[in-house]
Swiss-Prot record:
GO terms for biological process: formation of cytoplasmic translation initiation complex; Golgi organization; protein secretion; sperm individualization. This is Eukaryotic translation initiation factor 3 subunit M. Pfam families: eIF3m_C_helix, PCI. The keyword Thylakoid does not apply. It comes from the Eukaryota. It comes from Drosophila willistoni. Residues 181-340 form the PCI domain. The lineage of its organism: Eukaryota, Metazoa, Ecdysozoa, Arthropoda, Hexapoda. PROSITE patterns: PCI.
């Protein structure tokens, strides 16, 4: 989201005077006279009534008024500006409709970018900015990912408690439109807990698991099991369900669902979507140990008909998690490679053996090339002696 620098070609006193007159004219309970307590008191009074312009003003006009308020606000020293900034942010969340919410969003973004990057107030502005972005469907304009979020606060990192609060908000505003991003936010949230306080993160851990399971583009779920708050859920149904998605096959999920239908539905999970994901995960697991699979075997493992095998495999290939070739003539699927669902000690050993084999092959090639080069050199020398 772009933002223009704040600059008003009037003195602070003149701006304050004009704003007071403007809001009084709109019917706000404010004096048109400047406060004798200074510009900060003026700002408190102006911000207290600034939402009166939301009633009848045009968006462009309101944007200009808010821009004037921001231009004064950023001149206030940090140690005296917190209450003023927080009061303004609260007012910006009160926009009565989407067009005005966009104006308020632009104003908050302008304030955010004009505050010093080392100012702790930027966190509070950004938090309210996300709230307003949700109101006008502009969340993707202000939050593009966790890396971008962290870079914005690099010069003044918020506390763990503040980031937890922000991550919860970001999860809430993205869960209906971008499950993948929402899932990453929840994983970051759980990563902020330590062994000492992970036990209090039960609700966050459950939300994280549900979001990851519901995301149609998240297939590698093994890392969730290592998160401390998730470990505290061992023995709970949600942890059992996660474990199935991490390492079990389709029949295990079907059995779990038959025994705990109410629980699965109560978490907001869609059974058919779960079946679709578990079929893909089951196929990945089968591909790890089978270079080829018959259509008949796949119908049994995936609980689909033979006519559904080809469309299913094509969908799997689109994810790029598995590389394979369909052999329609022989009713088989030939596997080239697959991503592992879990990556533990066996996978590390397999990787080590593969790298060792590559090393030995490269050594053999190098030795062969050295021998060829040596033979060519000897031949050249012998021919030189003959002549």
């Amino acid at each position: 989201m772009t933002s223009h620098p704040v600059f008003i070609d009037l003195s602070l006193d003149e701006q304050v005077q004009e704003l007071r007159k403007y809001f009084k004219k709109l019917g706000a309970e404010i004096s048109s006279e400047k406060s004798n307590k200074g510009v900060e008191d003026d700002l408190h009074k102006i911000i207290g009534v600034c939402d009166v312009c939301f009633k009848d003003g045009e968006p462009a006009q309101i944007d200009g008024i808010l821009n004037s308020i921001v231009s004064i606000m950023i001149t206030i020293p940090l140690d005296r500006g917190e209450n003023i900034v927080l009061a303004y942010c609260e007012k910006m969340t009160k926009a009565p409709n989407q067009p005005l919410a966009k104006v308020c969003l632009q104003s908050l973004w302008r304030l955010f970018n004009n505050l010093d990057t080392a100012s702790p107030l930027r966190y509070h502005v950004y938090y309210h900015l996300v709230q307003v972005a949700k109101q006008c469907d502009q969340v993707l304009e202000v939050f593009t990912g966790v890396d971008q979020l962290k870079s914005q606060f690099a010069n003044c990192p918020p506390s763990s408690e503040q980031m937890q609060k922000l991550y919860r908000l970001l999860h809430d505003v993205t869960k209906d439109t971008n499950l993948e991003r929402s899932s990453k936010v929840m994983i970051e949230l759980l990563g902020t807990y330590t062994a000492d306080n992970a036990c209090v993160a039960r609700e966050d851990a459950m939300k994280c698991i549900v979001t990851a399971l519901a995301d149609p583009n998240t297939f590698l779920l093994d890392p969730l099991l290592s998160l401390k708050p998730v470990r505290f859920l061992e023995g709970d149904l949600i942890h059992d369900l996660l474990s199935i998605f991490v390492s079990e096959k389709l029949p295990a999920y079907v059995e779990f669902y038959e025994e705990h239908k109410e629980f699965v539905n109560s978490q907001g999970l869609n059974h058919e979507q779960n079946m679709k994901k578990m079929r893909l995960l089951t196929f990945m697991q089968l591909a790890e140990s089978n270079a080829e699979m018959s259509f008949e075997a796949l119908t049994k493992e995936l609980q689909i008909t033979e006519n559904e095998v080809e469309p299913f495999v094509i969908e799997v290939l689109k994810t790029k998690l598995v590389r394979a070739r369909l052999d329609q003539a022989n009713r088989k699927v030939h596997i080239s490679s697959t991503m592992h669902r879990t990556f533990g000690a066996p996978q590390w050993e397999q990787l080590r053996d593969l790298l060792q084999a590559w090393k030995e092959n490269l050594s053999s090639v190098r030795e062969g090339l050295t021998n060829v080069a040596s033979a060519q050199l000897d031949l050249a020398r012998s021919q030189k002696l003959i002549h």
